[in-house]
A protein has these predicted regions:
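Conserved glycine-rich beta-strand-loop-beta hairpin in the small C-terminal domain of fold type I
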Residues: 260-270, 281-295
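N-terminal "arm"/small-domain region of PLP-dependent enzymes with the aminotransferase-like
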Residues: 1-40, 51, 311-314
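Conserved core segment of the aminotransferase class I/II
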Residues: 190-193, 198-260
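Hydrophobic residues in well-ordered beta-strands that form the structural core
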Residues: 92, 113, 168, 242, ...
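Conserved core of the PLP fold type I
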Residues: 22-162, 173-175, 180-191, 195, ...
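Short beta-strand segments
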Residues: 4-5, 113-115, 134-136, 167-170, ...
Length: 359
């Protein structure tokens, strides 16, 4: 039984609609066996993505503003390769997304760890000279809270003051469980300060590995060149299939179908954190995504707990690896993307029993 943040249950994906779209793509490929394809991505897929994110996330863009990538990680890589030079100052949330930090460091950047609070990134801590700011404003990773409206405006103002580009990683944004969803930060951007990154790998299937970036014109042209030099273009069959999948409304149906499943799992974990697990942990009230974070109360050894839980076949994951600087806030990431509803109580019973033995 795993409470992994990374894994997703594949049984929630309807194979019939996906297979029909893939068959369509195979038939289409036979009609264009020697056609050259744009590094930017197929126009029909970019049109479908632009329509989807305008409706779902309030993103202002057209198909010409989009670059199709092999997942969000390649989108981050291409943007960073275009903008980051050795010694370049990059700011990102702490705690934050380790692969983004590792990417910036690998390209020679100086990465500043900016603390977060209940309203998100603490903008006043962004250092002078920063050229790139990486944030997850809709659903802070890993803690889960959204960035407040005043903080969003402050971030845009600070980026304009610095002449910096903001990378908005809008991961896990499709699944929201209560309250109105805040639009993407990019919607507030009137000056081309935001590069918006998204992916279908988490919403649909991890194996899909298709993501996208909405980029300011100056960045887009260079990123398309970098994409071409990297791998020419993302897999054409998958692009045709996904364009069809989006165009026929299957994504929205999938989200509506899965929402009830994930919502029930989330509510069950919250109920346990608010009852018999409350002497040891307090939940951060995140309202979107596929995981919850729970902060440990004084005296709880999270690393020991995670190790002991694995011995009773429960996968637990500590918050510690997501912090780059002290003070680390001890706690757990509790993913509900892969675990079945009926397995949550048995898994958390074992966690509770382990905590009682440690107390």
């Amino acid at each position: 039984m795993t409470l992994s943040v990374v894994r997703r249950a594949r049984r929630n994906f309807r194979l019939t609609s996906g297979a029909a779209c893939l068959n369509y793509a195979l038939r289409r490929s036979q009609r264009h066996p020697e056609r050259q394809f744009p590094a930017q991505g197929l126009p029909e897929l970019r049109e479908a993505i632009a329509h989807h994110i305008a409706y779902a996330r309030g993103v202002h863009c057209s198909a010409t503003d989009l670059l199709v990538c092999n997942g969000a990680q390649q989108a981050l890589d291409l943007i960073a390769r275009v903008l980051v030079e050795p010694g370049c100052q990059v700011a990102m949330e702490d705690p934050g997304y380790p692969p983004a930090r590792q990417l910036f460091l690998a390209l020679g950047a100086r990465v500043q760890s900016v603390p977060v609070d209940d309203e998100g990134l603490r903008v006043e801590h962004i250092a002078d000279g920063t050229r790139l700011i990486y944030v997850t404003p809709s659903h802070q990773f890993p803690l889960g809270m959204p960035m407040s409206e005043p903080r969003r405006h402050a971030l845009l103002a600070r980026a304009a003051e610095l002449g910096a580009l903001i990378i908005e990683d809008d991961y896990d944004c499709e699944f929201r469980y209560h309250g109105p969803a805040a639009d993407a930060l990019q919607r507030l951007d009137c000056h081309g300060l935001v590069a918006y990154v998204g992916t279908f790998s988490k919403t649909l299937l991890p194996e899909l590995r298709l993501g996208y970036a909405v980029l300011p014109p100056a960045v887009l042209q260079a990123a398309c060149v970098a994409k071409h030099l990297s791998d020419w273009h993302s897999p054409t069959l998958l692009q045709w299939a996904l364009a069809r999948f989006l165009g026929e409304g299957h994504l929205n149906k999938h989200i509506r179908r899965c929402h009830e499943v994930y919502s029930a799992r989330r509510e069950r974990i919250l109920a346990r954190l608010g009852s018999d697990l409350s002497p040891w942990f307090s939940a951060i009230p995140a309202s979107a995504g596929f995981h919850l974070s729970a902060l440990a109360k004084p005296g709880v050894d999270v690393e020991l707990l995670a190790n002991l839980a694995r011995k009773v076949e429960v996968g637990l994951y500590s918050l510690a690896p997501f912090f780059s600087e002290a003070p680390i806030r001890p706690g757990l990431l509790l993913g509900f993307g892969a675990i079945e509803l009926l397995d949550i109580d048995p898994a958390l019973d074992r966690v509770r029993d382990t905590l009682q033995r440690l107390s």
